[in-house]
A protein has these predicted regions:
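Active-site beta-strand-loop-beta-strand hairpin of nuclease catalytic cores
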Residues: 91-103
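Short glycine-rich, polar/acidic loop-and-turn segments at beta strand-coil junctions
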Residues: 72, 93-95, 108
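Acidic, metal/cofactor-coordinating or nucleic-acid-engaging core segments within structured domains
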Residues: 112-143
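Nuclease-adjacent, charged terminal/linker segments that flank catalytic cores
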Residues: 1-79, 84
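Short, well-structured alpha-helical interface segments that form or flank functional binding sites
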Residues: 82-87, 99, 143
Length: 143
């Protein structure tokens, strides 16, 4: 696991070394490089696409968020895997209601993947462990 010491970036290229497979995933027009460019160009604010999604929720706790820190490729230990999962961007934010932590999965033109029902039907034992763990953490059991 990487150290939990964070160094501010000077450009999007600083994000490349944090990828699980930097040479494979760092390509123009793909999600990793596009995400870095988007967040870097918006700093110190949240990207407008994120603001719009949160505004659509109509939840006042998700409105007028101030970005405190954006951490690229945040590693999350989940059961059932042989390596940590990586969140594209972990954003620490706040507003008058308090602190909000956002986990962002960024996509350019890729699919998010199969639905949970489809994934569960073909899940390996490790994937099943992860799904069950997340369902329990989010208090949303599949049954």
């Amino acid at each position: 696991m990487k150290k939990r010491i964070f160094v501010p970036t000077t450009s999007g290229s600083d994000w490349q070394r944090l990828l699980a497979k930097p040479k494979l995933h760092w390509k123009s027009g793909r999600s990793a490089m596009s995400t870095a460019a988007c967040w870097e160009s918006c700093s110190p604010n949240l990207p407008p696409e994120i603001v719009d999604v949160l505004a659509a929720s109509k939840d006042s706790a998700l409105m007028n968020l101030e970005l405190l820190a954006a951490i690229p490729e945040w590693e999350v230990q989940l059961p059932g895997g042989d390596r940590p999962s990586q969140t594209d961007v972990l954003a620490l934010t706040r507003n008058d209601a308090g602190m909000v932590v956002l986990g962002v999965e960024a996509k350019v033109d890729e699919e998010f993947g199969p639905t949970l029902g489809t994934k569960r039907a073909a899940a390996s034992p490790g994937q099943q462990d992860r799904l069950t763990f997340l369902e329990n953490q989010l208090d949303c059991p599949s049954k």
